[in-house]
Design a protein with these regions (language model features):
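N-terminal topogenic module of multi-pass integral membrane proteins
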Residues: 1-82, 88
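Juxtamembrane loop-transmembrane helix junctions in multi-pass integral membrane proteins
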Residues: 24-31, 55-62, 84-88, 118-125, ...
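Structural signature of hydrophobic alpha-helical transmembrane segments
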Residues: 58-72, 120-133, 156, 188-192
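C-terminal ends of transmembrane helices
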Residues: 75-85, 139-147, 205
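Membrane helical hairpin/interfacial module
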Residues: 75-101, 106
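C-terminal halves and exits of single transmembrane alpha-helices
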Residues: 98-124
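Alpha-helical membrane segments in multi-pass integral membrane proteins
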Residues: 127-140, 150-174, 180-204
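Short, highly charged, low-complexity non-transmembrane loops/tails of multi-pass membrane proteins
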Residues: 212-223
C-alpha cells in the first residue's frame, strides 16, 4: 500500500511513500518456540524423574503418557508452525526432538508388546542401537548449530551427554539384561539439568512473546 505525502515533489506532483506494513496476525505469525520449549520441558522432566528413581527401577513406560501425548505431539505441531512462519532452523530442531521423543515411545511400547518380533535376547542390543543412533544425530545437531546462542548449544550438548551415559548404562548390562543403575541415574540427572536450561529458554521466549525483553542467551560459539 502507498500513501500520498502532503508535500509535493520538485515536479509539483504528490510524492508516494510506502506505508508501514500492517503487523501479521493469526496462524502465520507468532513464536512457536514458546509452545515447543514447554513441550520439551514436560517430557524431559518426566523422563529425568523416572531415571533418577521416582518410579520403580525398570518401569520404562512410566513417562510415556507425557512423552507421547504432550512432548512428541507438541514438538511436531510446533515444527509445522515454525516451518509455516519461515523459521527453518527452529523447525529442524523441533522436528528432530519431536521424532526423538516419538521414537522413544514407539521403542518402549514396541519392546513391551513385541510389535517388531524382536527376540528377548536382542532387546538390549535394540536399545543400544536406538541410543547410539540418536547420540550421533544430536551430536551432529550440536555441531551444525554452533551459530545459535550458546544456551541452545548447552542444551544440545547436555542431551548428547545424557544419551552417552544411557548408552554406557546399557553397555554394562548384567547377564540378566539389567543396565547399570548408577549410570541410568547419572543420565537422569543430566536430563533434569537440560530441562532446567530449557526452562530458562522458555522464560526468555515467553518474556519476548508477552512484550518484554528476552533474557540473555549467551554468544554464539561460531560467528
Amino acid at each position: 500500500m502507498t500513501t500520498v505525502d502532503a508535500t509535493a515533489g520538485e515536479s509539483g506532483r504528490p510524492v508516494a511513500e510506502e506505508a508501514p506494513a500492517a503487523p501479521v496476525v493469526g496462524p502465520m505469525a507468532g513464536d512457536p518456540s514458546i509452545w515447543g520449549l514447554a513441550s520439551f520441558i514436560a517430557g524431559s522432566v518426566a523422563l529425568g524423574l523416572a531415571l533418577v528413581g521416582v518410579v520403580p527401577f525398570g518401569v520404562l513406560g512410566a513417562p510415556l503418557a507425557i512423552i507421547l501425548a504432550a512432548t512428541a505431539l507438541g514438538l511436531l505441531l510446533s515444527t509445522i508452525w515454525a516451518a509455516a512462519v519461515g523459521q527453518s532452523a527452529v523447525a529442524a530442531v523441533f522436528g528432530i526432538f519431536g521424532t526423538f521423543w516419538l521414537s522413544y515411545a514407539v521403542l518402549v511400547l514396541g519392546l513391551d508388546h513385541n510389535w517388531f518380533a524382536i527376540p528377548v535376547l536382542a532387546a538390549v542390543a535394540t536399545v543400544r542401537l536406538f541410543l547410539l543412533t540418536w547420540l550421533i544425530i544430536i551430536v551432529l545437531l550440536t555441531l551444525a548449530t554452533l551459530r545459535l546462542p550458546s544456551a541452545f548449544t548447552a542444551v544440545f550438548a547436555l542431551v548428547s551427554l545424557a544419551l552417552l551415559l544411557l548408552l554406557l548404562a546399557w553397555e554394562q548390562t548384567s547377564p540378566l539384561g539389567v543396565p547399570s543403575s548408577s549410570l541410568l541415574k547419572a543420565g537422569g540427572w543430566v536430563v533434569l539439568v537440560f530441562a532446567a536450561v530449557g526452562v530458562y529458554l522458555f522464560f526468555s521466549a515467553a518474556q519476548a512473546g508477552t512484550g518484554g525483553k528476552a533474557l540473555p542467551l549467551g554468544p554464539a560459539l561460531m560467528k
